From Swiss-Prot:
The gene is pym1b. It is found in: Cytoplasm; Nucleus, Nucleolus; Nucleus, Nucleoplasm. Disulfide bonds: none annotated. This is Partner of Y14 and mago B. Key regulator of the exon junction complex (EJC), a multiprotein complex that associates immediately upstream of the exon-exon junction on mRNAs and serves as a positional landmark for the intron exon structure of genes and directs post-transcriptional processes in the cytoplasm such as mRNA export, nonsense-mediated mRNA decay (NMD) or translation. Acts as an EJC disassembly factor, allowing translation-dependent EJC removal and recycling by disrupting mature EJC from spliced mRNAs.
Amino acid sequence: MATPYVEDESGKYIAATQRPDGTWRKPRKVKDGYTPQEEVPVYENKFVKFFKGKPDLPPGMSPGDEAQARQQQQGIPGIAESETAGLSKTAKRNMKRKEKRKLQGPDSNVEALINAVEMPTSNPAEATNDPSGAAAEKAKKIKNLKKKLRQVEELQQKLDSGEIKQATKEQLDKLGRAKAIQDGLLQLEEDS
């Protein structure tokens, strides 16, 4: 839809238009060289341009010849279009498996799901008593506390050097927790 322009002695205007609710829009002045968004051509890269310019038919074939060729192909018995015609071997195998599952019925799926649910719940005690998991968790906590302690030390250095003139409430809280972090780190290192 093109924008209706009106020209008079003072310049170019977009004409006053009526809104769906019945009110009128004011006419708007348009600067020289302005092109409305609807009229700006959409960017197309070279591949899009190539495929738009590419003919649908092979070179030398007319649209009438194409219709005849399609009718001849439909008449050939071996070219009947089936749902598996363009599929690979793997896709055909997967379709056969799906059909077998449908024929077996939903009972086998229910049994498989029940077995899958029962297996993980049978040994939750073994998972919590795993010593390597507990050691890994302690190592992770130690690493985390060392990181927090390093951040507190860096913050203290910045305050001492004057890089930070006034500490915020959160920064003061972090400095206040330094002793608790050190105690927790020492306790974890003694336990491991």
